[in-house]
């Protein structure tokens, strides 16, 4: 499976015990660049999920008994093998998700780097002694057993590969739920991983979320779940899981992230940061971390908006396998319709389209293409200012005072990221302290730094990832006391 023309003939499978699982039904996957049929994948049922979990339990027992450095060595073997398949995984995500292949190569590289960082943390899995008495008291970190990772469609390979690293390093086996819309790289990951990892240690399940995903969440032998996706689905997972067992659940959910540009900021860098932070050229704005609200001080608003419009209008939209394309289509008809509806609501409430707003030129009639869009004169509290669009739509809001900027930034249910642009170091610290976000950048867009905890507050999630916090979260702490006399 190395070229686009093989999609029709390649049979995608869920592997259990080293062979394809006999899944009764399949469902179609569409090509976002044309809107037409691409391929079909297994649509796993509850019984299929249970079969995978039972196989995974057997694999975990031996894996969890290995010393952490031995697990790290195996993880690095996997990293080396995945690197050999870099172009294949980038192509899969480009075709399956509509994302520019150049950016998907970056996604593969980022995933492998983060996996390597988790391998580096092997010896940090030790516990500690606590001198609370003359006896010996110590803690150890022990794996949960079988854990589940449920990925999102917008960074398919990155969320598959990098998000299984911490659970595996911690000694767990992993059931990986492939995204409904973009399952191909997750399925291929399991095929490649089977060449170096113990059998059934990593099993990818494909299928509709309402059946396969729900079966994973409700399975009584999966006690740890990590989910990336929408806030509504995150709440559903919490409800479903609570009905069957007490489970440890981490959630990286939606965002309506603000970039706050003060009058004393480097306005050129702020404009660049606003456009880059929107992830137009990575995922067509389909990112929980997209900085979709640009808050600009009234004294510099015209200047900043003009530069943002210039930058956005220069983005080349085209087919994902075109090396010159900087932005591809949206992943599905549903995502396209959601963005178009949001733009319409914004206009209805008084916003003005200053860039994009419709279908870009030169992409033909097929596919779910939408030009990168900027809306000015967006009112705080309006539909488009409050709701996560998950598309290429940037809203510009004007503020007059620091207090007003903070109030607008905090006036949504989300709290994932925020950016503060200012040359005043005191203001930078004060605003960063006041904004309600789990990840704050000063004079920066939306870059992740691997090793730093990343996670949201409010309705943006529970828990932190990409860091030691993520690794430890896939263990349970055991305290032991040895009475010495």
Curated annotation (Swiss-Prot):
Inhibited weakly by Mn(2+), Mg(2+) and Ca(2+), but not affected by Zn(2+), Co(2+), Cu(2+), EDTA or EGTA. Optimum pH is 9.0. InterPro entries: Ald_DH/histidinol_DH, Ald_DH_C, Ald_DH_CS_GLU, Ald_DH_N, Aldehyde_DH_dom. GO terms for biological process: phenanthrene catabolic process. It catalyses: 2-formylbenzoate + NAD(+) + H2O = phthalate + NADH + 2 H(+). Its EC number is 1.2.1.78. It holds the Pfam family Aldedh. Keywords: Aromatic hydrocarbons catabolism, NAD, Oxidoreductase. Plays a role in phenanthrene catabolism by catalyzing the oxidation of 2-carboxybenzaldehyde to phthalic acid. Not active with 3-carboxybenzaldehyde, 4-carboxybenzaldehyde, benzaldehyde, salicylaldehyde, 2-methylbenzaldehyde, 2-chlorobenzaldehyde, 2-fluorobenzaldehyde, 2-benzaldehydesulfonate, 2-methoxybenzaldehyde, 1-hydroxy-2-naphthoaldehyde or n-hexylaldehyde. Homotetramer. This is 2-formylbenzoate dehydrogenase. The gene is phdK.
């Amino acid at each position: 499976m190395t070229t686009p023309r093989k999609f029709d003939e390649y049979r995608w499978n869920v592997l259990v015990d080293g062979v394809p699982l006999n899944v009764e039904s399949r469902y179609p996957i569409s090509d976002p660049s044309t809107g037409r049929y691409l391929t079909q994948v297994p649509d796993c049922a509850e019984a299929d999920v249970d079969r995978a979990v039972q196989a995974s339990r057997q694999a975990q027992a031996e894996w969890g008994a290995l010393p952490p450095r031995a697990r790290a060595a195996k993880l690095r073997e996997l990293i080396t093998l995945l690197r050999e398949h870099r172009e294949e995984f980038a192509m899969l995500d480009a075709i399956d998700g509509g994302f520019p292949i150049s950016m998907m190569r970056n996604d593969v590289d980022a995933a492998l780097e983060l996996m390597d960082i988790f391998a580096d943390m092997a010896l940090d899995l030790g516990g500690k002694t606590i001198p609370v008495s003359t006896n010996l008291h110590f803690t150890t970190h022990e794996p949960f057993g079988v854990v589940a990772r449920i990925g999102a469609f917008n960074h398919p390979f990155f969320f598959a590969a990098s998000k299984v690293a911490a659970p595996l390093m911690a000694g767990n086996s992993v059931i990986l739920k492939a995204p409904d819309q973009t399952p191909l790289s997750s399925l291929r990951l399991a095929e490649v991983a089977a060449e170096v990892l113990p059998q059934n240690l990593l099993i990818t399940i494909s299928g509709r979320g309402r059946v396969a995903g729900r079966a994973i969440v409700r399975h009584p032998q999966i006690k740890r779940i990590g989910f990336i996706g929408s806030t509504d689905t995150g709440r559903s997972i919490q409800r479903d899981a609570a009905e069957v067992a007490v489970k440890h659940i981490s959630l990286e959910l939606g965002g309506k992230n603000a970039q706050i540009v003060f009058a004393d900021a480097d306005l050129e860098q702020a404009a660049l940061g606003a456009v880059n932070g929107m992830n137009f050229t990575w995922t067509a704005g389909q990112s929980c971390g997209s900085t979709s609200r640009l808050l600009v001080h009234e004294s510099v608003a015209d200047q900043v908006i003009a530069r943002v419009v210039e930058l956005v209008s220069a983005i080349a939209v085209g087919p994902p396998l075109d090396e010159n394309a900087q932005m591809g289509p949206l992943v599905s008809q549903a995502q396209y319709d959601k963005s178009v509806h949001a733009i319409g609501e914004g206009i209805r409430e008084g916003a003005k389209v200053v860039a994009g707003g419709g279908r870009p030129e030169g992409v033909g009639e097929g596919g779910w293409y939408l030009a990168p869009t900027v809306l000015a004169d967006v009112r705080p509290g309006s539909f488009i200012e409050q709701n996560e669009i998950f598309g290429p739509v940037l809203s510009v809001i004007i503020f007059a005072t620091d207090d007003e900027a903070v109030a607008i930034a905090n006036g949504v249910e989300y709290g994932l990221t925020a950016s503060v642009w200012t040359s005043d170091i005191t203001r930078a610290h004060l605003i960063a302290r006041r904004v309600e976000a789990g990840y704050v950048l000063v004079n920066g867009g939306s870059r992740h730094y691997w090793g730093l905890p990343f996670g949201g507050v409010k309705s943006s999630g529970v828990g932190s990832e990409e860091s030691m916090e993520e690794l430890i979260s896939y263990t349970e702490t055991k305290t032991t006391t040895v009475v010495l006399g």
